[in-house]
Amino acid sequence: MKNKKQTLLIFSLICNLILLFLIFPVNRARIRILFFSIMGYSSGNVPNFRDTLLVTEFKPKSQYKQTHSNKDIPSFPVIESHGHLGLFFKTNPAQVSKALDDLNIEYFINLNTRGGKDFLDIKKEYNDKRILHFTSFRWDYIKEADGVSKILATLKSDFEAGARGVKLWKNFGLELKKPNGERLRLDDEILEPIFQEIERQEKIVSIHTADPEAFFYPIDETNERYEELIRHPEWSFNSEVFPKFQEIMEEREKMFKKYPKIKFVSLHFGEFAHRLEDADRLLTTNPNVSIDIAARIDELGRHPIQTREFFTKWQDRILFGMDGPPEKEKLSIYVRFLETQDEYFDYYPVNKPRKGIWKIYGLGLSTPILKKIYYENTKILLKL
């Protein structure tokens, strides 16, 4: 009996040592190579490799020999319909004006996210006539009993000071609360006086609603934007604290229909760059809505055939935008996406992080469509 226990103990120890040995990938590799070497299918050489690799460290260099058209500057003048300036974006007026000259940007729409003094200050600082400034609602008033009246008064003042339109950010619909503590819905009736004033003054509303749908899902191995979300966990809306993605989209639809005389620009392709059938429905059912491509060519370039068909169908309702200051590196990627048929290239500049592990394909749009997207559609919308 004693010998039997000793035998089992030794056997168990050997098994555990084998398992411990096999835990390490390099040891498993040695066994495989030894096996195939004995079979005559391997030289027996054990290559050097890292046992583990973080997804953020995985930056493969493709062996695919890419064709590069070397098309970096747009073929036509550009109106940047979704630009940002100021301290957060590390810009200065002289630098921006020079970039507009160098990059053939005819007008630059600066979408401010605050109204009142902040709007007046940046408008005064960036006074190049090619820069058109949008204001925003003073949401810091919204929890006050007379907050809507204060927002309306500030908005009127900003319009008198030259604001060409209104920018609404994603906190509207996701986070903002009314005085009673309830979430402020996109189609909330308490905002009617404000939107009625926008309609009366015939101003444009550029609205950023929600974020990519992946931001509403768990940050785990199934999320293709995992790398982006672990870098920016504050962008995650996968919580009961926030409404669901579809709920916000439905509220936005009601808002668009509630104010049919207001011209809306649904920014970031309406957050439907990954679902073109929904983008098609959005434009079909809301003739007062346009969309821009800002910060969504990463999604659009993944399905170029469908995207090209969509751009052809809706060529009068798509605006050019890059979601930031005027930058040559970023512009060159947008130009490559819109104008060439290059394949399998990066959608981000070398000095910027990627959103997910994929590449994009160019659309090779025709000259008439390019002109509309680059500048004609925005000129019509803003009556330039």
Q: What are these model-predicted stretches?
A:
Residues S62-T67, N92-Q95, G115-K123, S149-T154, ...:
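Alpha-helical scaffolding within the catalytic cores
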Residues F89-K90, E240, Q246-K254, Y259-L384:
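H/E-rich (His + Asp/Glu) clusters that bind or coordinate divalent metals
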